[in-house]
Amino acid sequence: MSSERRKLTIPQLAAVVAGNGLEFYDFLIFGFFAIQIGQCFFPGHDATGSLLLTLATFGVGFVTRPLGGAVIGPLGDRIGRKPAMLFCFGLMGFSILGLVLTPSYASIGIAAPILVVLFRLLQGFALGGEVGPATAFLMEAATPERRGLYVSLQFATQQAAILTAGLVGMLLSNLLSDQALADWGWRVAMALGVLVVPFALILRRRLPETLEHKSETAFPRPSRAQMRIGFFAVLTLAAATVATYTMNYMNIFGSHTLGLPAAETFGAVVVAGSCGVLFNPVGGWVSDRL
């Protein structure tokens, strides 16, 4: 990328990382409110059975995440990072809105959980496709001496999403009764992400394209050494995501298994997310100097 295209403004940088953060926020809200969502869409089971069905529905989103990465990643290499990010973010907004508006099991019966599974599949596909182009955009937009810092912002905003989701959950659990949370409170938490989607799309439409080569350019096959490095990088990233999934499950375990008040379990998530927001950029900054 030319030197002038490296001069990414703060609003443009915020548009990339904020979009990623918003997508993780809504993805995680579903897990944070799994107990309440289970009561809405799987009411015919006991509390444990309802929770397990909800967690299974949550897990469905992870099935399509690799597919989203495999499809959108190469597509972004050909048509550009910006179109790929716009498509993924629009699809994410559509799937979130679908989840918010899906009627309960009491209203439309078995169609309700079927719709939830469908929207979760779309949500997972969009999130899986978003991460690659957004991370590549940050790498291509950064100068060599700031590349680690720029890319670390991608992961810092994921932690910010956990922090924000925890704060929203803490606020709603303090203001609403358990029944209100199950009836409509979780929809409010998820709808907050939908409200920001139009503004984020506008910001992303104004982003410069960072992909230099033309779509018809042939891509060389990666060498064996490059594939080995990529393999170990994937393992490292997979290990790092364990912390994110632990924080996602922390609220469910605390409320359902330990019997802790929801506000306390959300508070633990807030603390963990705050640490991630602070230390991810520090790690990126250090990597630029090693």
What positions do the PLM features span?
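Extracytoplasmic gate region of multi-pass secondary transporters
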Residues: 30-31, 226-276
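Extracellular/periplasmic helix-loop-helix junction of adjacent transmembrane segments
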Residues: 34-67, 85
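C-terminal ends and interior cores of transmembrane alpha-helices
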Residues: 43, 90-109
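Helix-to-loop junctions at the C-terminal end of transmembrane segments
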Residues: 67-81, 280-290
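Hydrophobic core of transmembrane alpha-helices in multi-pass small-molecule transporters
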Residues: 108-128
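Glycine-rich segments within core transmembrane alpha-helices of 12-TM secondary carriers
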Residues: 126, 148-173, 196
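C-terminal membrane-cytosol helix-exit motif in multi-pass small-molecule transporters
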Residues: 170-174, 194-212
